[in-house]
Design a protein with these regions (language model features):
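Conserved SAM-binding loop of SAM-dependent methyltransferases across substrates and taxa
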Residues: 126-143
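Extended basic-aromatic, gly/pro-enriched interface segments that bind polyanionic ligands
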Residues: 122, 143-184
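Conserved AdoMet
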Residues: 2-120
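Aromatic-flanked redox-active Cys/Sec active sites in thiol-based oxidoreductases
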Residues: 120-126
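Intrinsic, short, N-terminal disordered tails of RNA polymerase sigma-factor systems
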Residues: 6-7, 14, 140, 150, ...
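Short, well-ordered alpha-helices that flank and scaffold nucleotide-derived cofactor binding pockets
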Residues: 99, 103, 135-139, 165
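Alpha-helical elements of the RecA-like P-loop NTPase motor core of helicases
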Residues: 95, 131, 161
Length: 184
């Protein structure tokens, strides 16, 4: 996009910013504070260009009258959400899961003191995090089918499709040890 084109893009005024943040909070559960205004404006601008809509007010009207689970909301959510993830991300949390929860599960399994635990990966993006949990459960000597139920959800339909496919690029493995990668 050239300088002239970017100068012609509408600016998100205060009232429009409030209208969009309220709509996104109410319909999608996404929260945008004043510090995120620039990011929201740029991402909304992409949808305006894609749909050839001339103003934020017109786009807001379209969304306000659209079905919340409909195609345009799904497209907007895909535009707004950040989908940065990789295998074995958030090592400190995963270490705690293995040392505290998985160790206790393994001990209780011997006495059959409890059934499987449920782990929910909310905001799972393209699936690397829930798959990491299953890999670590296997490494800890657990049987994911017997000891563990892993649930994964994301607001982005596009990312959920990618998670179901289970195909990943090299960058998804940037923190994965060679041995684990070869094994799984």
């Amino acid at each position: 996009m050239g300088v002239i084109e970017s100068q012609l893009e509408p600016a998100l005024n205060d009232a429009e910013f409030r209208m969009f943040t309220e709509l996104l909070r109410r319909h999608c559960g996404l929260h945008y504070g004043p510090e995120s205004r620039f990011v929201l404006e740029k991402r909304l601008s992409r949808r305006l260009r894609e749909l050839e809509i001339k103003s934020f007010a017109a786009y807001h009207y379209l969304l306000r009258n659209a079905r919340p689970g409909g195609v345009e909301f799904a497209n907007l959510i895909d535009e707004l959400t950040t989908n940065e993830t990789y295998f074995l991300r958030e090592r400190s949390q995963l270490r705690a899961l293995v040392s505290e929860i998985f160790t206790e599960l393994r001990l209780q399994r011997k006495t059959r003191a409890r059934g499987p635990i449920s782990v929910w990966s909310a905001g799972c993006s393209s699936g690397e995090e829930p798959y990491s949990i299953v890999m670590l459960a296997l490494e800890a000597g657990l049987d994911p089918k017997q000891d563990l139920r892993v649930y994964a959800s994301d607001i982005s339909r596009k990312m959920l499709r990618k998670a179901r496919q289970g195909e990943y690029r090299e960058s998804s493995f940037r923190e994965t040890e060679r041995e684990l990668r070869a094994k799984y």
